[in-house]
Design a protein with these regions (language model features):
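Domain-level signature for soluble enzymes in the chorismate/prephenate branch of the shikimate pathway
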Residues: 1-356
Length: 356
Protein backbone atom coordinates (compact mmCIF):
# COMPACT_ATOMS: atom_id res chain seq x y z
CA UNK A 1 0.00 0.00 0.00
CA UNK A 2 3.03 2.29 0.30
CA UNK A 3 3.36 2.12 -3.48
CA UNK A 4 -0.34 2.91 -3.85
CA UNK A 5 0.07 5.89 -1.52
CA UNK A 6 3.01 7.16 -3.58
CA UNK A 7 0.97 6.88 -6.78
CA UNK A 8 -1.95 8.61 -5.08
CA UNK A 9 0.25 11.51 -3.95
CA UNK A 10 1.60 11.90 -7.49
CA UNK A 11 -1.94 12.04 -8.87
CA UNK A 12 -2.97 14.63 -6.29
CA UNK A 13 0.08 16.80 -6.93
CA UNK A 14 -0.51 16.75 -10.69
CA UNK A 15 -4.31 16.99 -10.44
CA UNK A 16 -4.78 13.62 -12.14
CA UNK A 17 -7.98 11.55 -11.75
CA UNK A 18 -7.95 8.39 -9.64
CA UNK A 19 -9.33 6.37 -12.56
CA UNK A 20 -7.04 5.85 -15.55
CA UNK A 21 -8.79 3.37 -17.81
CA UNK A 22 -6.24 3.43 -20.63
CA UNK A 23 -3.36 2.63 -18.26
CA UNK A 24 -5.34 -0.21 -16.68
CA UNK A 25 -6.02 -1.69 -20.12
CA UNK A 26 -2.31 -1.53 -20.93
CA UNK A 27 -1.43 -3.43 -17.76
CA UNK A 28 -4.15 -6.03 -18.35
CA UNK A 29 -2.97 -6.57 -21.93
CA UNK A 30 0.60 -7.01 -20.70
CA UNK A 31 -0.48 -9.48 -17.98
CA UNK A 32 -2.55 -11.49 -20.48
CA UNK A 33 0.49 -11.90 -22.74
CA UNK A 34 2.58 -13.22 -19.85
CA UNK A 35 0.10 -15.89 -18.76
CA UNK A 36 -0.91 -19.24 -20.28
CA UNK A 37 -4.21 -19.07 -22.15
CA UNK A 38 -6.10 -21.02 -19.47
CA UNK A 39 -5.03 -18.48 -16.81
CA UNK A 40 -5.67 -15.25 -18.70
CA UNK A 41 -9.19 -14.67 -17.36
CA UNK A 42 -8.12 -15.38 -13.78
CA UNK A 43 -5.15 -13.04 -14.11
CA UNK A 44 -7.31 -10.19 -15.38
CA UNK A 45 -9.82 -10.65 -12.54
CA UNK A 46 -6.97 -10.64 -10.01
CA UNK A 47 -5.47 -7.43 -11.35
CA UNK A 48 -8.84 -5.71 -11.65
CA UNK A 49 -9.34 -6.44 -7.96
CA UNK A 50 -5.92 -4.95 -7.20
CA UNK A 51 -6.85 -1.86 -9.23
CA UNK A 52 -10.15 -1.46 -7.37
CA UNK A 53 -8.56 -1.80 -3.93
CA UNK A 54 -5.81 0.64 -4.89
CA UNK A 55 -8.25 3.20 -6.28
CA UNK A 56 -10.43 2.93 -3.18
CA UNK A 57 -7.38 3.76 -1.05
CA UNK A 58 -6.35 6.64 -3.32
CA UNK A 59 -9.89 8.02 -3.30
CA UNK A 60 -9.83 8.39 0.49
CA UNK A 61 -7.57 11.39 -0.07
CA UNK A 62 -8.19 12.46 -3.66
CA UNK A 63 -11.99 12.66 -3.37
CA UNK A 64 -11.83 15.09 -0.44
CA UNK A 65 -11.78 17.92 -2.96
CA UNK A 66 -14.93 16.79 -4.81
CA UNK A 67 -18.21 18.73 -4.33
CA UNK A 68 -20.10 15.57 -3.34
CA UNK A 69 -17.48 14.64 -0.72
CA UNK A 70 -17.71 18.13 0.79
CA UNK A 71 -21.52 18.08 0.73
CA UNK A 72 -21.72 14.71 2.51
CA UNK A 73 -19.00 15.71 4.99
CA UNK A 74 -20.94 18.88 5.81
CA UNK A 75 -24.08 16.83 6.44
CA UNK A 76 -22.19 14.46 8.73
CA UNK A 77 -20.47 17.26 10.63
CA UNK A 78 -23.58 19.44 10.93
CA UNK A 79 -25.20 20.00 14.31
CA UNK A 80 -26.51 16.48 15.13
CA UNK A 81 -30.14 17.34 15.83
CA UNK A 82 -32.26 14.28 16.67
CA UNK A 83 -34.94 13.00 14.34
CA UNK A 84 -38.09 15.10 14.98
CA UNK A 85 -40.97 13.85 17.11
CA UNK A 86 -43.51 16.18 15.47
CA UNK A 87 -43.88 16.94 11.77
CA UNK A 88 -46.33 17.52 8.95
CA UNK A 89 -46.19 14.27 7.00
CA UNK A 90 -47.61 13.33 3.58
CA UNK A 91 -49.05 9.82 3.12
CA UNK A 92 -50.71 8.15 0.16
CA UNK A 93 -54.30 6.97 0.54
CA UNK A 94 -56.78 7.58 3.34
CA UNK A 95 -57.15 6.99 7.07
CA UNK A 96 -56.25 3.37 7.75
CA UNK A 97 -53.56 3.15 5.04
CA UNK A 98 -50.38 1.25 5.85
CA UNK A 99 -48.43 4.45 5.08
CA UNK A 100 -50.24 6.07 7.99
CA UNK A 101 -49.20 3.20 10.25
CA UNK A 102 -45.58 3.73 9.14
CA UNK A 103 -45.81 7.47 9.78
CA UNK A 104 -47.12 6.86 13.30
CA UNK A 105 -44.23 4.48 13.91
CA UNK A 106 -41.61 7.00 12.76
CA UNK A 107 -43.08 10.12 14.38
CA UNK A 108 -44.55 10.36 17.86
CA UNK A 109 -46.97 13.14 16.86
CA UNK A 110 -47.39 13.27 13.06
CA UNK A 111 -49.81 15.69 11.44
CA UNK A 112 -50.80 13.62 8.41
CA UNK A 113 -51.96 14.97 5.07
CA UNK A 114 -53.20 12.42 2.51
CA UNK A 115 -52.80 12.34 -1.26
CA UNK A 116 -54.24 9.88 -3.78
CA UNK A 117 -50.92 9.04 -5.48
CA UNK A 118 -47.29 8.35 -4.62
CA UNK A 119 -46.19 11.13 -6.94
CA UNK A 120 -48.61 13.45 -5.17
CA UNK A 121 -46.91 12.65 -1.86
CA UNK A 122 -43.54 13.60 -3.33
CA UNK A 123 -44.90 16.83 -4.78
CA UNK A 124 -46.36 17.79 -1.41
CA UNK A 125 -42.82 17.52 -0.02
CA UNK A 126 -41.03 19.29 -2.89
CA UNK A 127 -43.64 22.07 -2.90
CA UNK A 128 -43.17 22.63 0.82
CA UNK A 129 -46.68 21.63 1.90
CA UNK A 130 -45.25 18.84 4.08
CA UNK A 131 -41.89 18.43 5.78
CA UNK A 132 -41.75 14.69 5.16
CA UNK A 133 -43.38 12.03 3.02
CA UNK A 134 -43.90 8.29 3.57
CA UNK A 135 -43.55 5.86 0.66
CA UNK A 136 -43.55 2.02 0.47
CA UNK A 137 -40.42 0.79 -1.27
CA UNK A 138 -40.44 -3.01 -0.94
CA UNK A 139 -42.38 -5.91 0.50
CA UNK A 140 -41.01 -9.18 1.82
CA UNK A 141 -43.52 -11.15 -0.29
CA UNK A 142 -44.20 -9.09 -3.42
CA UNK A 143 -40.80 -7.46 -3.81
CA UNK A 144 -39.96 -3.89 -4.77
CA UNK A 145 -42.48 -1.14 -5.49
CA UNK A 146 -40.98 -0.18 -8.84
CA UNK A 147 -42.97 3.03 -9.19
CA UNK A 148 -41.21 4.44 -6.13
CA UNK A 149 -37.75 3.77 -7.54
CA UNK A 150 -38.69 5.52 -10.77
CA UNK A 151 -40.04 8.52 -8.85
CA UNK A 152 -36.88 8.78 -6.74
CA UNK A 153 -34.87 9.21 -9.92
CA UNK A 154 -37.23 11.84 -11.34
CA UNK A 155 -37.55 13.99 -8.23
CA UNK A 156 -34.90 15.63 -6.09
CA UNK A 157 -35.86 14.26 -2.68
CA UNK A 158 -33.78 12.53 -0.03
CA UNK A 159 -34.33 9.51 2.20
CA UNK A 160 -33.85 10.43 5.87
CA UNK A 161 -35.38 7.41 7.66
CA UNK A 162 -36.99 4.04 7.00
CA UNK A 163 -39.03 1.49 8.90
CA UNK A 164 -40.70 -1.89 8.52
CA UNK A 165 -44.39 -2.46 9.10
CA UNK A 166 -46.00 -5.85 9.59
CA UNK A 167 -48.78 -6.22 7.03
CA UNK A 168 -51.78 -8.41 7.91
CA UNK A 169 -54.43 -8.17 5.21
CA UNK A 170 -58.15 -8.57 5.93
CA UNK A 171 -60.99 -9.17 3.50
CA UNK A 172 -63.49 -6.45 4.43
CA UNK A 173 -66.99 -5.57 3.25
CA UNK A 174 -69.92 -3.38 4.20
CA UNK A 175 -71.96 -4.52 7.19
CA UNK A 176 -74.42 -7.25 6.24
CA UNK A 177 -72.39 -8.54 3.28
CA UNK A 178 -72.15 -12.32 2.91
CA UNK A 179 -68.94 -13.96 1.69
CA UNK A 180 -70.78 -16.01 -0.95
CA UNK A 181 -72.27 -12.83 -2.46
CA UNK A 182 -68.91 -11.24 -3.27
CA UNK A 183 -68.45 -10.56 -6.99
CA UNK A 184 -65.68 -7.94 -6.90
CA UNK A 185 -62.58 -7.39 -4.74
CA UNK A 186 -60.65 -4.10 -4.75
CA UNK A 187 -57.15 -3.41 -3.46
CA UNK A 188 -53.72 -2.06 -4.29
CA UNK A 189 -51.74 -4.28 -6.74
CA UNK A 190 -49.11 -5.02 -4.08
CA UNK A 191 -51.79 -6.23 -1.64
CA UNK A 192 -53.39 -8.33 -4.38
CA UNK A 193 -50.01 -9.92 -5.09
CA UNK A 194 -49.40 -10.58 -1.39
CA UNK A 195 -52.76 -12.40 -1.13
CA UNK A 196 -52.52 -14.35 -4.40
CA UNK A 197 -52.94 -17.78 -2.77
CA UNK A 198 -56.24 -16.82 -1.15
CA UNK A 199 -57.54 -15.05 -4.25
CA UNK A 200 -56.66 -17.89 -6.62
CA UNK A 201 -59.05 -20.17 -4.73
CA UNK A 202 -62.03 -17.88 -5.37
CA UNK A 203 -64.36 -18.53 -8.30
CA UNK A 204 -66.33 -16.01 -10.33
CA UNK A 205 -64.83 -13.06 -8.44
CA UNK A 206 -63.29 -10.11 -10.31
CA UNK A 207 -60.09 -8.69 -8.79
CA UNK A 208 -59.76 -4.97 -9.53
CA UNK A 209 -56.56 -3.01 -8.73
CA UNK A 210 -57.13 0.19 -6.77
CA UNK A 211 -54.90 3.11 -5.80
CA UNK A 212 -54.71 2.26 -2.11
CA UNK A 213 -55.95 -0.36 0.37
CA UNK A 214 -57.70 2.21 2.58
CA UNK A 215 -59.27 3.97 -0.42
CA UNK A 216 -60.56 0.56 -1.52
CA UNK A 217 -62.11 0.01 1.90
CA UNK A 218 -63.76 3.42 1.80
CA UNK A 219 -65.28 2.63 -1.60
CA UNK A 220 -66.53 -0.82 -0.58
CA UNK A 221 -68.05 0.49 2.66
CA UNK A 222 -70.43 2.64 0.58
CA UNK A 223 -71.48 -0.18 -1.77
CA UNK A 224 -75.29 -0.52 -1.50
CA UNK A 225 -75.31 -3.82 -3.42
CA UNK A 226 -73.28 -5.67 -0.76
CA UNK A 227 -71.40 -7.57 -3.50
CA UNK A 228 -67.90 -6.08 -3.19
CA UNK A 229 -65.01 -6.44 -0.75
CA UNK A 230 -61.58 -4.91 -0.18
CA UNK A 231 -58.21 -6.18 0.96
CA UNK A 232 -57.28 -3.68 3.65
CA UNK A 233 -55.72 -3.21 7.08
CA UNK A 234 -57.34 -3.93 10.43
CA UNK A 235 -57.50 -0.18 11.04
CA UNK A 236 -60.17 0.11 8.34
CA UNK A 237 -62.61 -2.14 10.20
CA UNK A 238 -63.66 0.49 12.74
CA UNK A 239 -62.83 3.51 10.59
CA UNK A 240 -65.34 2.55 7.91
CA UNK A 241 -67.68 0.33 9.99
CA UNK A 242 -66.88 -2.81 8.01
CA UNK A 243 -67.47 -6.53 8.25
CA UNK A 244 -64.51 -8.95 8.37
CA UNK A 245 -65.15 -11.74 5.86
CA UNK A 246 -61.71 -13.37 6.15
CA UNK A 247 -58.76 -12.66 8.42
CA UNK A 248 -55.02 -12.55 7.68
CA UNK A 249 -55.31 -13.62 4.05
CA UNK A 250 -51.72 -12.75 3.06
CA UNK A 251 -49.65 -15.59 1.56
CA UNK A 252 -47.19 -15.68 4.46
CA UNK A 253 -47.57 -14.87 8.14
CA UNK A 254 -44.30 -12.94 8.10
CA UNK A 255 -45.30 -10.22 5.66
CA UNK A 256 -43.55 -6.87 6.07
CA UNK A 257 -43.31 -3.71 3.99
CA UNK A 258 -40.38 -1.28 4.13
CA UNK A 259 -41.36 2.37 4.09
CA UNK A 260 -38.99 5.25 3.46
CA UNK A 261 -39.34 8.74 4.88
CA UNK A 262 -38.34 11.43 2.38
CA UNK A 263 -37.50 15.11 2.81
CA UNK A 264 -36.83 17.96 0.40
CA UNK A 265 -33.36 18.64 1.80
CA UNK A 266 -30.71 16.05 2.59
CA UNK A 267 -30.17 15.37 6.30
CA UNK A 268 -28.07 12.75 8.04
CA UNK A 269 -29.44 12.16 11.53
CA UNK A 270 -27.40 10.54 14.32
CA UNK A 271 -27.14 6.76 14.07
CA UNK A 272 -27.57 6.67 10.29
CA UNK A 273 -25.77 3.73 8.71
CA UNK A 274 -27.76 2.74 5.61
CA UNK A 275 -27.15 4.50 2.29
CA UNK A 276 -29.19 4.30 -0.92
CA UNK A 277 -27.76 5.20 -4.32
CA UNK A 278 -28.56 4.74 -8.01
CA UNK A 279 -26.04 4.17 -10.80
CA UNK A 280 -26.13 3.79 -14.56
CA UNK A 281 -22.95 2.03 -15.65
CA UNK A 282 -21.39 1.61 -19.05
CA UNK A 283 -22.67 -1.49 -20.84
CA UNK A 284 -19.33 -3.33 -20.66
CA UNK A 285 -18.16 -6.58 -19.04
CA UNK A 286 -16.86 -6.13 -15.51
CA UNK A 287 -18.39 -2.73 -14.69
CA UNK A 288 -20.78 -4.07 -12.04
CA UNK A 289 -18.02 -6.27 -10.62
CA UNK A 290 -15.81 -3.18 -10.32
CA UNK A 291 -18.43 -1.36 -8.23
CA UNK A 292 -18.99 -4.39 -6.00
CA UNK A 293 -15.22 -4.60 -5.49
CA UNK A 294 -15.22 -1.04 -4.15
CA UNK A 295 -17.82 -2.00 -1.56
CA UNK A 296 -15.70 -4.95 -0.53
CA UNK A 297 -12.51 -2.88 -0.38
CA UNK A 298 -14.06 -0.33 1.97
CA UNK A 299 -15.89 -2.84 4.18
CA UNK A 300 -19.35 -1.71 3.06
CA UNK A 301 -22.08 -4.34 3.45
CA UNK A 302 -24.32 -4.60 0.37
CA UNK A 303 -27.85 -5.26 1.67
CA UNK A 304 -29.83 -4.65 -1.53
CA UNK A 305 -29.15 -4.67 -5.26
CA UNK A 306 -32.02 -3.91 -7.64
CA UNK A 307 -31.99 -3.36 -11.41
CA UNK A 308 -34.53 -1.39 -13.45
CA UNK A 309 -34.74 -0.99 -17.26
CA UNK A 310 -33.58 2.36 -18.63
CA UNK A 311 -36.42 3.90 -20.68
CA UNK A 312 -35.50 4.16 -24.35
CA UNK A 313 -32.42 1.92 -24.06
CA UNK A 314 -33.22 -1.69 -24.89
CA UNK A 315 -31.93 -4.23 -22.37
CA UNK A 316 -29.84 -1.70 -20.46
CA UNK A 317 -30.38 -1.14 -16.77
CA UNK A 318 -29.92 1.26 -13.90
CA UNK A 319 -28.89 -0.24 -10.59
CA UNK A 320 -30.06 0.61 -7.09
CA UNK A 321 -27.82 -0.19 -4.14
CA UNK A 322 -28.43 -0.14 -0.40
CA UNK A 323 -25.21 -0.40 1.59
CA UNK A 324 -24.38 -0.36 5.28
CA UNK A 325 -21.31 1.59 6.37
CA UNK A 326 -20.98 3.90 9.35
CA UNK A 327 -21.04 7.60 8.47
CA UNK A 328 -18.18 8.03 10.95
CA UNK A 329 -15.95 5.68 8.98
CA UNK A 330 -13.44 7.89 7.15
CA UNK A 331 -13.94 5.76 4.03
CA UNK A 332 -17.66 6.55 3.83
CA UNK A 333 -17.70 9.96 2.13
CA UNK A 334 -14.81 9.07 -0.18
CA UNK A 335 -16.59 5.86 -1.29
CA UNK A 336 -19.79 7.73 -2.20
CA UNK A 337 -17.94 10.49 -4.05
CA UNK A 338 -15.74 7.94 -5.87
CA UNK A 339 -18.84 6.08 -7.08
CA UNK A 340 -20.04 9.40 -8.50
CA UNK A 341 -17.28 9.07 -11.13
CA UNK A 342 -17.73 5.37 -11.89
CA UNK A 343 -20.71 5.41 -14.22
CA UNK A 344 -22.71 7.35 -16.74
CA UNK A 345 -25.15 8.55 -14.09
CA UNK A 346 -25.13 8.60 -10.30
CA UNK A 347 -27.64 9.71 -7.68
CA UNK A 348 -27.22 9.79 -3.93
CA UNK A 349 -30.62 9.25 -2.29
CA UNK A 350 -29.50 9.62 1.30
CA UNK A 351 -28.06 8.03 4.42
CA UNK A 352 -30.46 7.09 7.19
CA UNK A 353 -31.38 4.80 10.06
CA UNK A 354 -33.88 1.98 9.62
CA UNK A 355 -36.31 1.45 12.50
CA UNK A 356 -37.24 -2.22 12.83
Amino acid sequence: MEVVNTIGEFKREHDMPVNNGSREREVLTHISKQLPEDLEDFGRVLYRSIFDISKAYEAMYKEKDSPLYKAISNLINADPAPFPKRAIVACQGREGAYSQIAAEKLFEVPEIMFNNTFEGVIRMVTDGLCEYGILPIENSTAGSVNEIYDLLVRYNVHIVRSTRVRVDHQLLAAKGTRFQDIKTIYSHPQAINQCSHFLSALKDVEIIPFDNTAMAAQKVAKDPTRTSASISSKSCIDLYNMEVLAQDIQNFDSNHTRFICIAKDARIFPGSNRTSIMMVMSHKPGTLFSVLSKFNATGANLVKLESRPIPGRDFEFMFYFDIELSIYDKKFASLISELDHCGEQFKYFGTYLEII
